[in-house]
Amino acid sequence: MAKVLVLKSSILGDYSQSAKLIDHLQQHWQGQGAEVTVRDLAAQPLPVLDGEIAMGLRGGDELSPRQQEVLALSDELVAELKAHDTLVIAAPMYNFSIPTQLKNWIDLVARAGVTFTYTETGPKGLVEGKRAVLVTTRGGVHKNGASDHVVPYLKTVLGFIGIDEVETVYGEALNMGPEANEQGISQAKQSIEQLVA
């Protein structure tokens, strides 16, 4: 049975376009018997990386209670990622980039010696044998353009930790009028259905 980890990161709750697409994807995967775990990074926000947390993520014997708590949370997030075959990331574009909530997850998961390591030939990802699906929504049209700092960034981060098989579902032009919105959502749903077929 396929095991799918879904990360939602929209701050818009029921109004979220990316969450609606993720729900569509989740229904299709569950219909095929997949086990789906959903982590809503906006509803259950993670701590923001700061100096104390950064030092704590390195481990050690003399950690503050806060550092111990965040290190345990980071270990939990990494274990959750490694326990699933497929990672699905809902990544709406906010001001040309990803939501803060998603960046917080990345900062707690991308850890030297845990999800990647440095070798004589350069960095090597340690989260191997996984597949990722990015579901990204935008008010305008940014696919493959210089203004898209969502997909290239996420592909770089995922590749850095060892996840090289990455597919992307785009929902674009969603704020460019009702017709454009309907068309953008429809095309994204078609991409989802092809992806899970």
From Swiss-Prot:
Its cofactor is FMN. FMN binds at residues 10, 16-18, 93-96, 137-140. Quinone reductase that provides resistance to thiol-specific stress caused by electrophilic quinones. Also exhibits azoreductase activity. Catalyzes the reductive cleavage of the azo bond in aromatic azo compounds to the corresponding amines. The keyword Cell membrane does not apply. GO terms for molecular function: electron transfer activity; FMN binding; oxidoreductase activity, acting on NAD(P)H as acceptor; oxidoreductase activity, acting on NAD(P)H, quinone or similar compound as acceptor. The gene is azoR. Belongs to the azoreductase type 1 family. Its EC number is 1.6.5.-, 1.7.1.17. It catalyses: 2 a quinone + NADH + H(+) = 2 a 1,4-benzosemiquinone + NAD(+); N,N-dimethyl-1,4-phenylenediamine + anthranilate + 2 NAD(+) = 2-(4-dimethylaminophenyl)diazenylbenzoate + 2 NADH + 2 H(+). This is FMN-dependent NADH:quinone oxidoreductase. Coiled coil: none annotated. The lineage of its organism: Bacteria, Pseudomonadati, Pseudomonadota, Gammaproteobacteria, Alteromonadales. Binds 1 FMN per subunit. Homodimer. Keywords: Flavoprotein, FMN, NAD, Oxidoreductase. InterPro entries: Flavodoxin_fold, Flavoprotein-like_sf, FMN-dep_NADH:Q_OxRdtase_AzoR1, NADH:quinone_OxRdtase_FMN_depd.
